[in-house]
Design a protein with these regions (language model features):
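Helix-turn-helix DNA-binding module
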Residues: 121-161
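Structural recognition of an alpha-helix C-terminal capping motif at a helix-to-coil junction
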Residues: 24, 38-45, 58-70
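N-terminal module of bacterial RNA polymerase sigma factors
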Residues: 1-21, 28, 108-112, 128, ...
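Conserved RNAP core-binding helix
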Residues: 15-16, 23, 33-50, 144
C-alpha cells in the first residue's frame, strides 16, 4: 500500500476513490447527510490512524467499509435511529443506480410508473420495520450486493452466520410484504 510507504498523495486518491460509495452506504444507514459525512470522515481518520493494523488479507475497501459500517451501526444504536423510510433519497446520488432500481423497465405508462412507485414505498416501509440487524443484512447483500465473504469480513462473523442472517432477514421481509403482494 503506497500510503504506508510514505506516499501522501495515495491518501487523497483513496479518499477520492471510496468516499462517494462509502458516504452513500452510510447515508442509507443513518438517514442524515451531515451524520453520514461525519461518519465517512471519521472512518477515513480511523483508517489512517490504524493503517498499520491493515493486514491486506482483504481489500482495503473491505477493511475501510468494516470500520465505517461498525461506526454507523454504533451511531444508530446510540441515537436510537433505525429508520430507513426515506431510503430512496439515499439512492439519489448512487454511483451505480442499476443496483438499486426496483422499477420494471417495462413500466412506461404513467399508471404503471405510479404502481411501481407504490411498490417501492411498500418495500421501504417493510425494510424500515425490520430489526437493525436484519436491515443491515438487506443493505449489505441486496442493496450493496456484497459477497458473503465481504459481509463476513465487515461484520467479523463467519460466512455461515452471514448466510443464516441473510436468510432470516429476507424471510422477515417476505413476511412483512406478503399481505401486500398476496393478490398478485
Amino acid at each position: 500500500m503506497r500510503y504506508r510507504q510514505g506516499d501522501k498523495d495515495a491518501l487523497g486518491e483513496l479518499i477520492q476513490k471510496y468516499q462517494s460509495r462509502l458516504y452513500t452506504t452510510l447515508l442509507k444507514i443513518c438517514q442524515n447527510p451531515d451524520d453520514a459525512m461525519e461518519l465517512c470522515s471519521d472512518a477515513f481518520v480511523k483508517a489512517v490512524e490504524n493503517i498499520d493494523n491493515f493486514k491486506a488479507e482483504s481489500s482495503f475497501y473491505t477493511w475501510l467499509f468494516r470500520i465505517a459500517v461498525n461506526q454507523a451501526l454504533n451511531f444508530v444504536k446510540r441515537k436510537g435511529l433505525v429508520s430507513f423510510s426515506s431510503a430512496e433519497t439515499a439512492f439519489a446520488n448512487e454511483d451505480e443506480p442499476e443496483r438499486v432500481e426496483f422499477a420494471s423497465q417495462e413500466a412506461s405508462m404513467p399508471i404503471d410508473q405510479l404502481l411501481e412507485d407504490e411498490r417501492k414505498q411498500v418495500l421501504w416501509r417493510a425494510v424500515d420495520s425490520l430489526e437493525l440487524h436484519h436491515k443491515t443484512m438487506i443493505l449489505l447483500r441486496d442493496i450493496d450486493q456484497m459477497s458473503y465473504n465481504q459481509i463476513a469480513e465487515i461484520l467479523e462473523i463467519t460466512q455461515g452466520t452471514v448466510k443464516s442472517r441473510i436468510y432470516r432477514a429476507r424471510e422477515a421481509l417476505r413476511l412483512k410484504l406478503l399481505p401486500y403482494f398476496e393478490g398478485e
